[in-house]
């Protein structure tokens, strides 16, 4: 499987169709620009990514970045797109039984009903919307593990936001022996329940989904998009310089010294 490296993370260079054909088991993460910035600063988040079997590019900005680096990623595969594609792909596969963990009270249950109605069978067999701060409550986490293990689910979709969802999967994956596929999918459960409005398709296609989200939740997201994520472009430029210098092996050794410091 071909990989594309952007900053300190390798992405799987797959189309949506290739991913669905290949996925039989494993951990699926959908990194975006915000993930890459957090990975630079958060060792526990980076450690959580070490168990990921599939890193799917969930950002048009990262698609542009991969082209800038000379290693284009085939396709943007967001969590909110891949999940409906996944359950439709396995529509007749009785072995796929999904547990939804995340979203606000009652939202996951609404998503369950909507998905099962679309599919025509009870593919989503159980849900749970955990309380705020659940990840710090070991007793609550153990209750969640028991719920999942007793549900009969083979697929776990966790939608509690990054880096919380990835860290939770990393910590408790081995306590969930019946789960074959783990997916960390952010706001996907909210989207499936029609609880949160998605960006217009044209905005997603040109890389402006972040702007739609910022305008929808300015108080929560302004710092992420207007302060934290701006750092990404500096890091990307540094990576490009390194690649350029590596190609020019006849250059001045002083340039190599500069590259090593970047």
Can you name each region flagged by the protein language model?
Residues 61-66, 198-255:
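A transmembrane-helix-recognition feature enriched in membrane-embedded lipid enzymes
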Residues 25, 94-96, 177-181:
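A short helix->loop->beta-strand "cap" motif at the edges of active sites that frequently abuts
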Residues 1-83:
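N-terminal nucleotide/polyanion-binding subdomain common to many enzyme families
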Residues 130-135, 178-216:
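Short, flexible loop segments at boundaries between secondary-structure elements
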Residues 111-112, 166-175:
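Short Gly/Thr/Asp-enriched flexible loops that form oxyanion-binding sites at enzyme active sites
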Residues 67-152:
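Conserved beta-alpha
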Residues 62-64, 164, 188-193:
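Short gly/pro/ser/thr-enriched loop/turn and capping motifs at secondary-structure boundaries
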Residues 148-157, 161-162:
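Proline-aspartate-enriched helix->loop->beta-strand connector
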């Amino acid at each position: 499987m071909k990989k594309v490296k952007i900053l300190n993370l390798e992405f799987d260079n797959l189309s949506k169709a290739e991913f669905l054909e290949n996925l039989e088991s494993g951990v699926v993460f959908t990194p975006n620009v915000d993930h890459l910035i957090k990975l630079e600063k958060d060792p526990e988040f980076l450690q959580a990514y070490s168990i990921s079997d599939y890193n799917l590019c969930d950002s048009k900005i990262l698609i542009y970045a991969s082209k800038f680096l000379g290693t284009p990623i085939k396709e943007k595969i967001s969590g909110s797109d891949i999940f409906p594609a996944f359950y439709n792909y396995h529509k007749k596969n009785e072995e796929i039984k999904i547990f939804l963990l995340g979203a606000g009270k009652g939202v996951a249950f609404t998503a369950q009903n909507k998905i099962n109605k679309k599919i025509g069978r009870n593919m989503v067999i159980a849900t749970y919307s955990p309380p705020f701060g659940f990840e710090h409550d070991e007793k609550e986490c153990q209750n969640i593990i028991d719920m999942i293990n007793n549900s009969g689910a083979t697929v776990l979709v966790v939608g509690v936001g990054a880096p919380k969802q990835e860290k939770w999967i990393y910590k408790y994956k081995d306590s969930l022996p019946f789960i074959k596929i783990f997916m960390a999918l952010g706001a996907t459960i909210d989207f499936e329940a029609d609880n949160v409005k998605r960006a217009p398709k044209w905005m997603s296609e040109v890389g402006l989904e972040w702007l739609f989200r910022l305008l929808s939740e300015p108080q929560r997201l302004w710092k992420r998009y207007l302060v934290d994520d701006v750092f990404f472009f500096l890091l990307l430029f540094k990576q490009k310089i390194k690649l350029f210098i590596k190609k020019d092996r006849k250059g001045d050794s002083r340039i190599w010294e500069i590259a090593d410091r970047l």
